[in-house]
Amino acid sequence: MSIKYVATSKLPTPWGVFAMHGFEDTETSKEHVALTFGTLSSDAPVLGRIHSECLTGDALFSLRCDCGFQLQTAMQNIAETGSGFILYLRQEGRGIGLLNKIRAYELQDKGANTVEANEQLGFPADMRKYDMIQPMLEQIGVKHVRLMTNNPRKVKAMKEIGIEVVERVPLQVGKNRYNEAYLKTKSTELGHMMSEYHFTDEE
């Protein structure tokens, strides 16, 4: 994998003005983005998140997942902290792509869970890779992280490239009647670390 830094621009948001850094994978032509806020330290832990693209949740306000809620909460937390980063990776549908994700949703509408749907389409439960994060973090100057995630694979990916994960910060937001079963499957079958709050009926 060959990641090339392209350019940086300002990104005004409801939570403040972030910097948006563009990257291109010259082997796959996929484009990734790093958002940064404030002054990042290479010596002190920086609050951050690795976020995989989710068009339905991030842009179309879908309640089938917690992705959009997690992205907005991460940006808000970073702004309130005064500094931080988000690596926005173009890995739609845990790596299977948008159209296959819609096919998976169709199977879920018929009773399959999120893992079963991927497998019925011939895909692993999670196809995402994280080798692109090393050059992205080098570009923005981050070496120590307070990582906002429920996914142990992301913590492992950070450690494997030599980034110290000082703290895992849980990001449990967005539970609703449309995604409760999905969240439970992420915990029981994909190993995501979530509290019982996500598996009890809303009052």
From Swiss-Prot:
The active site is at 126 (proton acceptor), 128 (nucleophile). Its cofactor is Zn(2+). Coiled coil: none annotated. GTP binds at residues 49-53, 70, 92-94, 114, 149, 154. Zn(2+) binds at residues 54, 65, 67. Disulfide bonds: none annotated. It comes from the Bacteria. It holds the Pfam family GTP_cyclohydro2. Keywords: GTP-binding, Hydrolase, Metal-binding, Nucleotide-binding, Riboflavin biosynthesis, Zinc. InterPro entries: GTP_cyclohydro_II, RibA, RibA-like_sf. One of its GO terms (cellular component) is cytosol. Belongs to the GTP cyclohydrolase II family. Catalyzes the conversion of GTP to 2,5-diamino-6-ribosylamino-4(3H)-pyrimidinone 5'-phosphate (DARP), formate and pyrophosphate. This is GTP cyclohydrolase-2. It comes from Shewanella sp. (strain ANA-3). The lineage of its organism: Bacteria, Pseudomonadati, Pseudomonadota, Gammaproteobacteria, Alteromonadales.
